[in-house]
C-alpha cells in the first residue's frame, strides 16, 4: 500500500529533525565550530589563540572547543539551538597552524559574528573571549595572542580621552620624548616629603612625576594630604621653570564613588592628569576614561597586575591584546616596556606593542606578533610609557628603540642620583636634549650615543656623575615572550 501524503510529510519532518538535532555529547568540530572553508568577513571579530591540547586531544577538536566554549556551546547538545540562528552565532575555528619548533602548541584562528558582542563594552567582549574557556579541561594551556577588532565595532568606543597630539598641545612640548619619574620610595613618605620629591624632580627638568601603583590612601599619607602637597609642588615648579608640569595623581580606590571624588579634587586643584591602575577592572577603566574626556583630563594607566597573565608564553594573554583593549577603552598613557630596563620586554615584541598604541592602521607582521591587519577607525593614539630600571646612560638606546612619542620615566635613575633629586632630573633632561640634537643633525646616535653623552657631560656635572655611577648597567635577562611567529602553511589535520 502506498504511503499517504500525511505519512510522507511526517517522515520528512522526522528526517529533517534528525539531521538538525542529535542529542548527547558530540565533538565540537562536528557541531559546526570547525570550518576550514569559512570565508572571513570584514565585520568579524577575529582571535588568535595559542592552544596546548591535552595529551590525546586532536588540535582541530581543541580549537573547535575553544570556539564553542567562547561563543554558543555548552558540554552537550541542547534543543534550544533550534530556536536561534545557530549557524550564524557559532564561532568558527577556521585555521590551525603548529607553533614553529613546538610540536605541542598550535595557533588557532577563530572568527566571531559581530552581533555576539555588546557595542562599546570591553567587559562584554572579555566575558566571551577570555571567560570560561580558559578553564576548559580539553586544553592543557591557552593563550590569547592577538585580536582583530572590526572597524564597525571600534567605532562604538570613544578611544583615548586626550590622545598624543592634544596632550602635546596642552603641554606645549613637541619633537622629543616626555620625561617622567616615579616617586621613591613608593611607600612610607609623609605628604610634605612626598611634595618635596615632586618639586625637586620637576624643577630639575622633568615634565611629569607620578604616584606608584600602590600609593592610594594609607595611614602614613592620606590621599587629600598627598594631593595638596603635590599640587603645591607642581605649581611652584611650573612658575620656576616657565613650563607646564604635571603629576599623575592616583585616584584608584575601593569604589567608583571614591574614585570620582578623588578625580574631582585633582581637577579642582589644577592637575592636568590623573592615574588609575589596571587592577580596577575594565568597566571602571572605561568609566574613568569617560570622566577624563568629559573633564578635559589626561588619563594615565599603570598596568599593575598585567604580568600575572601576560608573562607566561603558553597560558594567559599577550600584552598586545591589553594594548588594543585599553586604546578602545580610552586611556591616554599605558606602560608598554623599555627593552633595556628591569621589566619584561623583548625588543621586537615591544615594537609591536608601541605600533599597536600609536599607528592609525596595523599591518600584519608575524615577527612583531601582529597577526592581523587592523584599522583603528580614527581612534586617538595612546602615549606609551617606558619605566623600570632605566637611566641617563641608556638614552641613545631608549630613543632608538622607542622613538619620540613616549614618556621615559626614570624613578631610581632620578631619585638615586648622589647629588640629589634635582641633579638626577637635570642629568636626564640634558642627556635627552643632547640625543635629540644629535638625531636632528642626522648623526648615528645609537652608535655614537656614549660619546654624545660624554661630550654633553663636560658641561653638566649632574650628567657626568650619573654616567660615572650607572655606567652601562642594563638588565640583560632573556625575555620569556620572544618572537616565534613565522609564516607556516595551514595544517588542517
From Swiss-Prot:
Catalytic residues (positions): 184, 302
Binding residues for substrate: 132, 182, 186, 303, 335, 387
CDD domains referenced in this protein's UniProt entry, alphabetically: RuBisCO_large_I (cd08212)
Site entry (Transition state stabilizer), positions: 342
Organism annotation: Galdieria sulphuraria (Red alga)
InterPro entries: RuBisCO, RuBisCo_large_chain_AS, RuBisCO_lsu_C, RuBisCO_lsu_C_sf, RuBisCO_lsu_fd_N, RuBisCO_lsu_N_sf, RuBisCO_lsuI
Subunit structure: Heterohexadecamer of 8 large chains and 8 small chains.
An annotated GO cellular component: chloroplast
GO MF annotations in UniProt: magnesium ion binding; monooxygenase activity; ribulose-bisphosphate carboxylase activity
Localization terms from the record: Plastid, Chloroplast
Gene behind the chain: rbcL
Chain positions with N6-carboxylysine modification: 210
Listed cofactors: Mg(2+)
Function: RuBisCO catalyzes two reactions: the carboxylation of D-ribulose 1,5-bisphosphate, the primary event in carbon dioxide fixation, as well as the oxidative fragmentation of the pentose substrate in the photorespiration process. Both reactions occur simultaneously and in competition at the same active site. Carbon dioxide and oxygen bind in the same pocket of the enzyme in a similar manner.
Family: Belongs to the RuBisCO large chain family. Type I subfamily.
Taxonomy, superkingdom: Eukaryota
An annotated GO BP: reductive pentose-phosphate cycle
Binding site for Mg(2+): 210, 212-213
Protein name listed in UniProt: Ribulose bisphosphate carboxylase large chain
Misc. comment: The basic functional RuBisCO is composed of a large chain homodimer in a 'head-to-tail' conformation. In form I RuBisCO this homodimer is arranged in a barrel-like tetramer with the small subunits forming a tetrameric 'cap' on each end of the 'barrel'.
Amino acid at each position: 500500500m502506498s504511503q499517504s501524503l500525511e505519512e510522507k510529510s511526517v517522515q520528512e519532518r522526522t528526517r529533517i529533525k534528525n539531521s538538525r538535532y542529535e542529542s548527547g555529547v558530540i565533538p565540537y568540530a562536528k557541531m559546526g565550530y570547525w570550518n576550514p572553508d569559512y570565508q572571513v568577513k570584514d565585520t568579524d571579530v577575529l582571535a588568535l589563540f595559542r592552544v596546548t591540547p591535552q595529551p590525546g586531544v586532536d588540535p582541530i577538536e581543541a580549537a573547535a572547543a575553544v570556539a564553542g566554549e567562547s561563543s554558543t556551546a555548552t558540554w552537550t547538545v541542547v534543543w534550544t539551538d533550534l530556536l536561534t540562528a545557530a549557524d550564524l552565532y557559532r564561532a568558527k575555528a577556521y585555521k590551525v597552524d603548529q607553533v614553529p619548533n613546538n610540536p605541542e602548541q598550535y595557533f588557532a584562528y577563530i572568527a566571531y559574528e559581530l552581533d555576539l558582542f555588546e557595542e562599546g563594552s570591553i567587559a562584554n567582549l572579555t566575558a566571551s573571549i577570555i571567560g570560561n574557556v580558559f578553564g576548559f579541561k580539553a586544553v592543557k594551556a591557552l593563550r590569547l595572542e592577538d585580536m582583530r577588532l572590526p572597524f564597525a565595532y571600534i567605532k562604538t568606543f570613544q578611544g583615548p580621552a586626550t590622545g598624543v597630539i592634544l596632550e602635546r598641545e596642552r603641554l606645549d612640548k613637541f619633537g622629543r620624548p616626555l620625561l617622567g619619574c616615579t616617586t621613591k620610595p613608593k611607600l612610607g613618605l609623609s605628604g610634605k616629603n612626598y611634595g618635596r620629591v615632586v618639586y625637586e624632580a620637576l624643577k630639575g627638568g622633568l615634565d611629569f612625576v607620578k604616584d606608584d601603583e600602590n600609593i592610594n590612601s594609607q595611614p602614613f599619607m592620606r590621599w587629600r594630604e598627598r594631593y595638596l602637597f603635590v599640587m603645591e609642588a607642581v605649581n611652584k615648579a611650573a612658575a620656576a621653570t616657565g613650563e607646564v608640569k604635571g603629576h599623575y595623581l592616583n585616584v584608584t580606590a575601593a569604589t567608583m564613588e571614591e574614585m570620582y571624588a578623588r578625580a574631582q579634587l585633582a581637577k579642582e586643584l589644577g592637575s592636568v592628569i590623573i592615574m588609575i591602575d589596571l587592577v580596577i577592572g575594565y568597566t571602571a577603566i572605561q568609566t574613568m576614561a569617560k570622566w577624563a574626556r568629559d573633564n578635559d583630563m589626561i588619563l594615565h594607566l599603570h598596568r599593575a597586575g598585567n604580568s600575572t597573565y601576560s608573562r607566561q608564553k603558553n597560558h594567559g594573554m599577550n600584552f598586545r591584546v591589553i594594548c588594543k583593549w585599553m586604546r578602545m577603552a580610552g586611556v591616554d598613557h599605558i606602560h608598554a616596556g623599555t627593552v633595556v630596563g628591569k621589566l619584561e620586554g623583548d625588543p621586537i615584541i615591544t615594537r609591536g606593542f608601541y605600533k599597536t598604541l600609536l599607528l592609525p592602521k596595523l599591518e600584519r607582521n608575524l615577527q612583531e606578533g601582529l597577526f592581523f591587519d587592523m584599522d583603528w577607525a580614527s581612534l586617538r593614539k595612546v602615549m606609551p610609557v617606558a619605566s623600570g630600571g632605566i637611566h641617563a646612560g641608556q638614552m641613545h638606546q631608549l630613543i632608538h628603540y622607542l622613538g619620540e612619542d613616549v614618556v621615559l620615566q626614570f624613578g631610581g635613575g632620578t631619585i638615586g642620583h648622589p647629588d640629589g633629586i634635582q641633579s638626577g632630573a637635570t642629568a636626564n633632561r640634558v642627556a635627552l636634549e643632547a640625543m635629540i640634537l644629535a638625531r636632528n643633525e642626522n648623526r648615528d646616535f645609537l652608535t655614537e650615543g656614549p660619546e654624545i653623552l660624554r661630550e654633553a657631560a663636560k658641561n653638566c656635572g649632574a650628567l657626568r656623575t650619573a654616567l660615572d655611577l650607572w655606567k652601562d648597567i642594563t638588565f640583560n635577562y632573556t625575555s620569556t615572550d620572544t618572537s616565534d611567529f613565522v609564516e607556516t602553511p595551514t595544517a588542517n589535520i
